[in-house]
């Protein structure tokens, strides 16, 4: 019966081993998991054209590799992998390899095509402060976002561009998008 299930699940919910999601008839129970270096809940913020941030969603990694997404507007859904709205943020191509080279501490390998969803989530959550789109995944990336102006490479004159281009080719240019 429902009361028996609720009674059995209550201590698991309180301990965080099981999470109750949804409301009323749409209520479900999911098994959260922790992604190394990221945790078991990952905030996602939206940055508007003026640079103001607002909550967008919270990602909950689930046992089996799925993700539960609780959007700030009340829409929630289960995704078999990383949600579609993070696809454009996934490091890829030349800039993705540059991103991997710039962050060896991630220990993910030099080719983002070989990264799994947890690897991508870790990269986004720790160093995804300057990627395509208006979303920032994770608290660490959001904190880095606030330091972008200090870290950005600036050209004082046209004569600086060759050196900046060389730095970009070597993967040492700060403040470049990885997309």
Descriptions of predicted regions:
Residues 2-179:
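Phosphate/dinucleotide-binding and metal-coordinating scaffold of catalytic cores
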